[in-house]
Swiss-Prot record:
Residues 1-73, 435-457, 573-598 are annotated as: Disordered. One of its GO terms (biological process) is regulation of apoptotic process. Keywords: DNA-binding, Nucleus, Transcription, Transcription regulation. Component of the DRM complex, at least composed of lin-9, lin-35, lin-37, lin-52, lin-53, lin-54- dpl-1 and efl-1. Interacts (via N-terminus) with efl-1. Interacts (via C-terminus) with lin-35 (via C-terminus). GO terms for molecular function: DNA binding; DNA-binding transcription factor activity, RNA polymerase II-specific; RNA polymerase II-specific DNA-binding transcription factor binding. This is Transcription factor dpl-1. Disruption phenotype: Uncoordinated movements, also known as an Unc phenotype, most likely due to defective cell cycle progression defects in the Pn.a neuroblast lineage. No obvious vulval development defects. Programmed cell death defect in a ced-3 n2427 mutant background. Double knockout with the n433 mutant of the synthetic multivulva class A protein lin-15A results in a multiple vulva (Muv) phenotype. RNAi-mediated knockdown results in reduced postembryonic intestinal cell divisions. It comes from Caenorhabditis elegans.
Length: 598
């Protein structure tokens, strides 16, 4: 290495040296005269040149030469980082020598001070050593023996993940493009060697052809319509051609023509024969013959993905056409009539909960109807099934794929009304018979036969708004008998509670044992109209044994306890029930109470 001639500088006392400070990108240089001198530091990454200040009092003598070059750790840390990043792999001596050379070359000083020059050299090397240790501690560089390798500036986890994802996608795209280029090259080699083999056989059989009939590679073929007007201009050296067409035209290169002549041994397709594969491998070196199998496997994989995508699109199109078209259902046989789906959407109730802005819309998610909610005797009536039975559900679509269209089971309809007046949705007699929430057994035979409510659950029905009573079918289970209003001392009627009682024929005394009695009592919320969603459960029916040994005090205590229970239940029923609670009761009915009449 050639020795470096360092420029001299004038030695100064420590108290007369320029004091340098860095603050917000500006350097403030304190001159010996006491006047500050500042200049803008535009970029710390660019090489900095230290300007020589003018002498004191405007003199330009040798004794007035001053230097404002920085020698701090912050400055040399930036320089060291730039040097290591630029080289990638370096060592301590190389970085220190280059920084020392740059430092003294950027300071033009006419006089030489050997002592000061030696001090600055040691100071710079010490700063470089400290900067390398800082970068090593921050994991920006790595050190192996004397070699120093650049890693990179630290970043956050999200930035590092995004950078790695971009790098991964970029490399995957590069690998994919290189694989395609490799496949094209393999096909070109096979095509060219197959063409050479065919020409050799033809020349051996028919002799060498004339020069006018030989088409040399590479070439281009341009074809267009027979009636098209083509204008062609050729340069003097026949290196440039200018074509003008008045109709569409196509351009084919030599490789495309060779593939159309089947000289690529059908490797561009997915089903080459074993003989063609063997011929193609014979044209390649032994080290590259496995690429033929990889090309065929990749072609088959791409073709399978395209076929799968096409099937999915076709299935989606078929489902959409099935939903949009008015399907004509075929009446199923007796065996198909008993088939029911595991779950179905209750569309009317779900739409009501979704459209009701005052309720919680999350209650509409996943409202289903179970199998026992479907009545078995759906074919009792002779009425034709209309479009109200054509409901959509993913379960029905999955069940009807690749099967003939079938009539779906009847779905219960639950209507919740918010405005006053009678129910807007009136059901047909057939639907009313199916969806009646109680048994069709007459009341006088219910106790004797031991019949219970439909689906072995509590009796539930909605109380409509308005004073107009709904049309009640024949054979109702119970009726509401209002009591006469009692007048208070203020002349205002009391809010008298209503009692739900059974008809006279519904109570049978021959089933009771001596000393037993039937207690039937149910308190309904007084007044009206009731809010939508109010549910009336079945009447409390219990067989109570008369206890003649009970003292009067015990009788009073028992009576008070019963009154408290009734008051608590009355307060609960006075609270309006939301649509979400009604949906929950419909979806998950309460467990059945013990039937004392069985």
């Amino acid at each position: 290495m050639n020795p470096t001639n360092y420029d001299p500088r004038i030695g100064q006392p420590a108290q007369s040296r320029p004091q340098v400070s860095l603050s917000m990108g500006r350097r403030i240089v304190q001159m010996p005269t006491g006047l500050p001198r500042s200049y803008q530091d535009e970029s710390h990454n660019e090489p900095v040149g230290w300007d020589e200040p003018s002498g004191v009092g405007g003199s330009s003598g040798a004794g007035g030469q001053q230097s404002d070059k920085p020698t701090g750790l912050r400055h040399f840390s930036t320089k060291v980082c730039e040097k290591v990043k630029e080289k990638g792999l370096t060592n301590y001596n190389e970085v220190a020598d280059e920084l020392v050379a740059d430092y003294f070359q950027n300071n033009l000083i006419k006089q030489i001070d050997v002592v000061k020059q030696e001090y600055d050299m040691k100071n710079i090397r010490r700063r470089v050593y400290d900067a390398l240790n800082v970068l090593l501690a921050m994991n920006i560089i790595t050190k192996s023996k004397k070699d120093i390798r650049w890693i990179g500036l630290p970043a956050s986890a999200s930035q590092e993940i995004s950078r790695l994802e971009e790098e991964k996608s970029r490399r995957e795209a590069s690998i994919s493009s290189k694989k395609q280029a490799l496949e094209e090259m393999v096909l070109q080699i096979v095509s060219y060697k197959n063409l050479v083999e065919r020409n050799r056989k033809n020349e051996h059989k028919n002799g060498r052809p004339e020069n006018d009939t030989v088409l040399h590679l590479p070439f281009l073929i341009i074809n267009t319509d027979k009636e098209a007007n083509v204008e062609c201009s050729v340069s003097s050296d026949k290196s440039e051609f200018l074509f003008s067409f008045d109709k569409k035209f196509e351009i084919h290169d030599d490789f495309e023509i060779l593939k159309k002549l089947n000289l690529a041994c059908s490797l561009e397709t997915t089903n080459p024969t074993a003989e063609e594969v063997k011929t193609a491998k014979s044209f390649l070196p032994t080290l590259h013959q496995h690429y033929v199998d990889e090309i065929i496997a990749n072609r088959k994989k791409v073709e399978a993905e395209k076929e799968e995508k096409r099937k999915q699109q076709q299935l989606i199109a078929d489902q959409m056409s099935m939903n949009l078209s008015q399907a004509q259902y075929v009446e199923p046989t007796s065996s198909l009539a008993q088939m029911s789906y595991s779950s179905r959407f209750n569309r009317q109730l779900q739409e009501h909960l979704i459209n009701d802005g005052s309720e919680d819309r999350s209650a509409a998610a996943g409202i289903m109807e179970r199998d026992y909610d479907m009545d078995k005797n759906v074919n009792q009536g002779s009425a034709s099934r209309g479009p109200m039975y054509n409901t959509y559900s993913p379960q029905k679509i999955r069940a009807q794929v690749n099967t003939p269209l079938q009539v779906p089971p009847v779905t219960k309809r639950y209507y919740v009304q918010k405005t006053q007046g009678p129910m807007k949705h009136d059901m047909t007699p057939v639907v009313r018979t199916v969806n009646r929430p109680y048994s069709t057994v007459p009341p006088d035979r219910r106790l004797s036969t031991g019949a219970t409510s439909v689906n072995s659950g509590p009796v539930k029905y909605y109380v409509p708004q308005g004073h107009q009573p709904m049309h009640q079918p024949v054979g109702q289970r119970y009726r509401v008998r209002p009591q006469q209003p009692q007048m208070s001392h203020m002349g205002q009627p009391h809010q008298v509670q209503q009692r739900v009682v059974y008809p006279a024929g519904s109570i049978s005394g021959h089933q009771l044992q001596p000393g037993q009695r039937i207690v039937t009592q149910r308190i309904v919320a007084p007044g009206g109209p009731h809010p939508p969603g109010t549910i009336v459960r079945k009447v409390i029916r219990k067989i109570v044994v008369n206890n003649p040994k009970q003292s009067p005090a015990q009788q009073v205590i028992q009576k008070k306890m019963m009154e408290q229970d009734m008051c608590t239940f009355e307060r609960k029923t006075e609270q309006p029930m939301t649509s979400a609670q009604a949906a929950a009761l419909i979806q998950h009915p309460q467990p059945e109470e013990y039937d004392y009449f069985q």
